[in-house]
Each structure stands twice: as C-alpha cells, then as structure tokens.
C-alpha cells in the first residue's frame, strides 16, 4: 500500500499539469471576431469612447485586429485603412463627452438585426441604427446608419 502513494501523487501531479496546460492554452488564444449578442457588440463599441483608460478613450481603433473583431468582411478593409476622417462616425463628432447610451433591438429581418442606439454627445442628441449580423464567430457590424449617411458610404467617400 505504501508503494502506491508516490505513484498516485505522480499521476495527480501530471493530471493537474495537463489541466493547467489546457487552461493556459485557451487563455493565450487570440481574440475571436464577433460578440455574443447585438447589445454586447454595441456596448463594446462605445466602451472605447469613455473618459477612463487611454486604450478605451480614444475612440474605436482603426487597425486590422479591431476591424476583424467588430466588422463583417465587407467593412473590415475600409475601417482598417481609414485615416484622417473628418469626424468619428460612431459619435458623429470630432470630440466626445457622451451621455447615457440606450440601445433597443428594432427588428430582426432574415440574417440581420437592426439595433437603434441613442445618446447625447456634448449635449447634442445622436441616433444611429446598427445593422448587425450573426456570423460564424459571433455578432459583427454590417453597417451603421445615421439620419444622413451610412458608415459604409462614409468610409467609401473618405477612402485614402
């Protein structure tokens, strides 16, 4: 019986190390595209427009990782390559101090979900309609409509 104790301890240590290795492997995986719900997608967009940490107060970054995570394939290149835009489309201004943000699912139509977003930016009311799709990796933005324009047309107009 005494001979089994060291062997059992070795087996347990190996088991724990394997579990830890699996866990560490999943934790080190790159960020996947998409989000779990349309509301989560919208919340994560506006998390980049706060007054807090530097990485989350400069607006949604225009890089390929952000583009892959937030946008469908049709918008990814346009978003990542857009530099020097006249204003930030998501806040409809060049600067921001956002009030409370509300979002409501307007309708679900085929593969698209329309999410109405309303907030104030520097005291001015802003309304946008996010058109989001549930892709293989989660929810991503297919387009965003303002009363005067759409994100897709805005990026095409200001292509570098």
What are these regions (language model features)?
Residues 68-124:
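Surface-exposed, charged secondary-structure patches
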């Amino acid at each position: 019986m005494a001979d089994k104790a060291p062997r059992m301890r070795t087996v347990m240590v190996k088991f724990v190390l394997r579990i830890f290795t699996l866990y560490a492997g999943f934790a080190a995986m790159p960020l996947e595209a998409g989000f779990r719900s349309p509301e989560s997608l919208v919340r994560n967009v506006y998390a980049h427009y706060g007054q807090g940490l530097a990485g989350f107060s400069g607006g949604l970054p225009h890089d390929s990782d952000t583009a892959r995570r937030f946008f469908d394939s049709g918008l990814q290149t346009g978003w990542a390559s857009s530099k020097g835009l006249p204003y930030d489309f998501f806040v409809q201004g060049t600067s921001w101090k956002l009030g409370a943000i509300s979002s409501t699912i307007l309708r679900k139509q085929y593969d698209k979900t329309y999410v109405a977003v309303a907030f104030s930016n520097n005291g001015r009311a802003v309304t946008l309609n996010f058109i989001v799709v549930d892709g293989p990796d989660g929810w991503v933005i297919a387009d965003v409509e303002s009363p005067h324009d759409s994100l897709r047309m805005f990026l095409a107009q200001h292509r570098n």
